[in-house]
Amino acid sequence: MMFGIINATKERLMRNRHLKWYRLDNAAKIFPSVMTSRMSAVFRISATLKSCVDAGILQKALENVIGRFPYYRVTLRSGLFWHYLQETDSVPRAREEFFDPCRKMNRREDGGFLFRVLYYRRKISVEFCHALTDGTGGVIFLKFLLAEYLRLRGVTAASGPGILSPEEIPDGEEFEDAYARYYKQ
C-alpha cells in the first residue's frame, strides 16, 4: 500500500514538472491567509445583455480567451513557507448561477481556479479571488470575454482601448508586481 502512494505521488510530481509557477504579488500575499468561510476575499463584476445567455457559446468564448490570460489559468498552492500560483492544464467551465454571489472559492466546484464565470438569464458574471487580480484586471477580462461572446453570436463587438485580441501576446507588465515596482523603497 505504501509503495502505491509513493508511486502515485511520484507520477503526479513528474506530470506537474512542466507546469510554470508564479509568485503571489505583494498585494495578494495576505488573501490566502485571511480567507475563511466568513471572509471569502472574492469580488464580482457583471454585465447584463439584451438577450438570454447561450451557455455553449459562453463556454466557447471562455475557452478562446483563457489562453490570452495564462496567469488566470492557475491554482493556488501552498509551499513550504509561502503560497504560490501553479499553472494548470485544466479548462475553466462557465456555469449557471444558482448560489449566493461572492461565495468562497471551492476547489472541487471551481476546478481549483481562482475565478469563476457564471450566467443567469441575461447576465454574465465573473467572480475573482483577490489573490488573483484586482478590479482593473477583472474588468479587462470581462470586457474581453463579452467581446468574444458577442463575436461568436455574430454581433459586431466594439474594439479599441481595453478590448484585447486573442492573438495578442500578454505584456510583461500584466505579470509584474506593481507594488514592488512603484512603492518599494
Predicted regions and their residues:
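Non-catalytic N-terminal regions of enzymes
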Residues: M2-K184
